[in-house]
């Protein structure tokens, strides 16, 4: 395949990618695992403190430079929605020229030597506009800009889909890989890149006979349509259930609960409660009577026959697609280029997790059963049902490990900047955006500054909710890193009458290029956007205080951002977060672990006047192990649904789910339920839902073995940067992890390595007291 735009991490990406590799020499150094914390804090700088004002007093920082006006993201041409449409058309012209150059390369040995580089250039040329358009589609408040973003996105993705199955491009690449002299001339980075390109073309059915390839295209189209239908069904509200006033007797909630009881008494009618509503959540937590909780659970996990049919058809089409290209199942096809490599390895990992988690989860379930026994004054331990979980173990909001003063957005960004300086010699610096550079007055611009090289990238922070903006938190890579001084653009050719369009596209790309000190070549520097929905500061109420889960979210997303900033590879297809699905969350999850350290939390104090120490703010939460076990079971379901058994005429997704829960689960399956139609990750993370658990396990191990005892140690930060972050997706993740942890036996990434990672999770998380 040619390329995959690098938009929101792991989401909303067209199935299309060109990828590259970086293989720079790694400096040798003595291994330095975590030791006693002896490193002193680096004092906060003026720039660090300026971050507080930037985000907590935005009225002071919204003045844009009117002496210098520009277009979106500093591109002078992008001043009007029409300019984005024009840019897409100009990019298409240049992409067609570059495609033709690659196709003609077989006529020249010199041109064949440029094929891998030109494939990456073609990918970057298209993705540079597609990724920008994707951000505009999801964040711009102007409808005309959104429409222009949609047009640009769809126009260039359509061309990408053509390239996906372009036999000529594949043939040219095969010519390179079948020529021993050319292969020998490729450095390891370029050779690995070529292999990845070849494998991706193979996945797109490129070598199939014409009729079979047409079937592949048809199935792919069906899968996209069914996927959209499945996601729509997953988010469709389930019908309400009737709850009698008498069933709400004794509600523990004295606020909403009292109001609901009064409503039922006043109307003299049953309450109609929608699953997932605030009322439903309150009843599940606070109703002593089991019946309303049971009814709400059944309603929340109901499905129509049509919804089940859509899911099962999607699963069958995926299985047919995989078998069309000679794979046993969709899981086999999907996992080929992941750390797991094959479904059997995922099974080894999940089995290890189950074996190690089950005792903790069973103990937790016994605690809940004892609570239920006492509540009902029963002579024996009762069975815990699915609707009992929230009542006997109500979820607590996440809390910091030690008491902290209120944390504002600016304070957290200041702490992040100080942490990055300690670890990597990199900091965040407020920058004034020019007039026209950002899409909304809320957006703040940050420079990412390396102490040796200066500015190495930019982060645009769009942190507050507004109408039309995408919900949730996300990290968008609008521009990837790559080396550009060896592009050889002069030999791309030209169509008659396209001079102005080519110039427009070239000028768009020229804005991105910079020469850094102490680094050979000219590079395109990364640019990312962070979207969140934090509370907005105001003049009357002052700076907005973040909930702890929002602090965790910010650290998580900034973990992705630093991966983009530090993973500056020569090939954009493997820069930053462009890596395997089951590896990409490691840097972001590891960032959350830093929030467990008092030394790191003290960085939120600009003047270092607060003494923080571990005093045991954690508490035992029996539901932590139960929830972990439930996540493992969902990962197992995902593997079953993408196994060869899907094509059996007797396959029934509900029966498969029920059998699995009753065989390996902790809480009995509830007849009549079909949760699988709401398991939206089955589409976006089909056969890879294990990835988050997998990366949590690795992150836990890295934290425990490398950082936990000295989290501000620069040597450890440099080690992690040099052995993991700087490579993006250009190096085998198993090699990176085994080197970082000094466990060479992991490098093979085989079944035993997967089992070993499964054991880590228990040692580092389930075995410890947790917070829910």
Swiss-Prot record:
CDD domains: M3A_MIP. Its cofactor is Zn(2+). It is found in: Mitochondrion matrix. Its EC number is 3.4.24.59. Disulfide bonds: none annotated. It comes from the Eukaryota. One of its GO terms (molecular function) is metalloendopeptidase activity. GO terms for cellular component: mitochondrial matrix. The active site is at residue 557. It comes from Coprinopsis scobicola (Ink cap fungus). The gene is OCT1. Zn(2+) binds at residues 556, 560, 563. This is Mitochondrial intermediate peptidase. Pfam families: Peptidase_M3 (PF01432). GO terms for biological process: peptide metabolic process; protein processing involved in protein targeting to mitochondrion. The lineage of its organism: Eukaryota, Fungi, Dikarya, Basidiomycota, Agaricomycotina. Belongs to the peptidase M3 family. Coiled coil: none annotated. Cleaves proteins, imported into the mitochondrion, to their mature size. While most mitochondrial precursor proteins are processed to the mature form in one step by mitochondrial processing peptidase (MPP), the sequential cleavage by MIP of an octapeptide after initial processing by MPP is a required step for a subgroup of nuclear-encoded precursor proteins destined for the matrix or the inner membrane.
């Amino acid at each position: 395949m040619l390329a995959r735009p690098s938009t929101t991490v792991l989401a909303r990406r067209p199935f299309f990618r060109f990828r590259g590799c970086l293989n720079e020499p790694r400096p040798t150094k003595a291994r330095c695992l975590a030791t006693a914390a002896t490193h002193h804090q680096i004092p906060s700088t003026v720039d660090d403190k300026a971050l507080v004002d930037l985000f907590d007093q935005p009225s002071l920082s919204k003045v844009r430079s009117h002496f210098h006006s520009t277009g979106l993201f500093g591109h002078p041409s992008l001043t009007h929605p029409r300019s984005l449409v024009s840019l897409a058309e100009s990019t298409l012209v240049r992409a067609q020229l570059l495609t033709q150059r690659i196709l003609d390369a077989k006529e020249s040995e010199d041109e064949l030597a440029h094929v891998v580089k030109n494939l990456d250039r073609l990918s970057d040329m298209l993705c540079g506009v597609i990724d920008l358009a994707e951000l505009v589609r999801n964040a711009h408040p102007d409808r005309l800009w959104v429409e222009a973003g949609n047009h640009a996105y769809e126009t260039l993705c359509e061309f990408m889909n053509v390239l996906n199955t372009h036999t000529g491009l594949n043939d040219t690449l095969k010519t390179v890989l079948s020529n021993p002299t050319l292969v020998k001339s490729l450095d390891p980075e370029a050779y690995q890149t070529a292999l990845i390109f070849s494998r991706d073309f193979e996945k797109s059915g490129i070598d199939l006979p014409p009729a079979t390839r047409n079937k592949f295209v048809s199935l792919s189209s069906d899968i996209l349509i069914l996927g959209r239908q499945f996601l729509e069904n997953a988010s469709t509200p389930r019908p309400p259930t009737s709850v009698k006033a008498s069933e709400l007797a004794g509600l523990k909630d004295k606020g909403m609960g009292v109001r609901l009881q009064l409503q039922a008494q006043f109307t003299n009618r049953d309450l109609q409660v929608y699953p997932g509503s605030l009322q439903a959540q309150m009843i599940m937590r606070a109703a002593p009577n089991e019946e309303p909780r049971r009814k709400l659970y059944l309603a929340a996990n109901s499905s129509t026959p049509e919804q089940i049919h859509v899911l099962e058809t999607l699963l069958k089409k995926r299985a047919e697609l995989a078998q069309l290209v000679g794979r046993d199942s969709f899981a086999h096809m999907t996992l080929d280029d992941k750390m797991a490599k094959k479904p059997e390895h995922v099974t080894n990992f999940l089995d290890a997790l189950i074996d190690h988690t089950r005792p903790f989860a069973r103990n937790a379930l016994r605690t809940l059963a004892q609570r239920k026994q006492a509540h009902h004054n029963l002579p024996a331990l009762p069975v815990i049902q699915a609707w009992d979980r929230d009542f006997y173990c109500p979820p607590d909001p996440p809390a910091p490990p030690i008491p902290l003063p209120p944390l504002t957005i600016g304070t957290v960004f200041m702490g992040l900047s100080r942490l990055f300086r300690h670890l990597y010699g990199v900091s965040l610096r407020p920058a004034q955006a020019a007039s026209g550079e950002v899409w909304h007055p809320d957006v703040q611009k940050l420079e990412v500054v390396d102490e040796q090289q200066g500015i190495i990238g930019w982060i645009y922070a769009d942190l507050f909710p507004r109408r039309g903006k995408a919900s949730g938190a996300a990290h968008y890579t609008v521009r990837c890193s790559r080396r550009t001084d060896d592009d050889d653009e002069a030999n791309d050719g030209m169509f008659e009458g396209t001079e102005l369009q080519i110039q427009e596209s070239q000028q768009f790309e020229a804005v991105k290029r910079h020469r850094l000190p102490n680094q050979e070549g000219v590079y395109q520097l990364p640019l990312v956007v962070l979207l969140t929905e934090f509370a907005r500061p105001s003049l009357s109420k002052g700076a907005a205080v973040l909930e702890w889960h929002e602090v965790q979210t910010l650290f998580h997303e900034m973990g992705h951002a630093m991966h983009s900033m530090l993973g500056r590879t020569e090939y954009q297809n493997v820069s930053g977060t462009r890596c395997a699905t089951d590896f990409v969350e490691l840097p972001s999850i590891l960032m959350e672990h830093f929030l467990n350290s008092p030394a790191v939390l003290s960085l939120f104090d600009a003047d270092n006047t607060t003494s923080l120490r571990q005093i045991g703010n954690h508490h035992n939460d029996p539901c932590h192990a139960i929830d972990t076990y439930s996540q493992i079971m969902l990962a197992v379901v995902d593997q079953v649904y993408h196994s060869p058994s899907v094509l059996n005429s007797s396959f029934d997704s509900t029966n498969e789910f029920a059998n699995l829960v009753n065989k390996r689960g902790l809480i009995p399956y509830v007849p009549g339920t079909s949760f699988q139609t709401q398991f939206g990750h089955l589409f976006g993370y089909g056969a890879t839902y294990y990835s988050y658990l997998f990366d949590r396990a690795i992150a836990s191990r890295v934290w425990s073995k490398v950082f936990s005892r000295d989290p501000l140690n620069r040597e450890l930060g440099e080690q992690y940067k040099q052995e993991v972050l700087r490579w993006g997706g250009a190096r085998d993740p198993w090699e990176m992890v085994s080197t970082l942890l000094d466990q060479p036996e992991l490098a093979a990434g085989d079944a035993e390595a997967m089992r070993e990672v499964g054991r880590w999770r228990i040692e580092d998380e389930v075995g410890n007291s947790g917070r829910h």
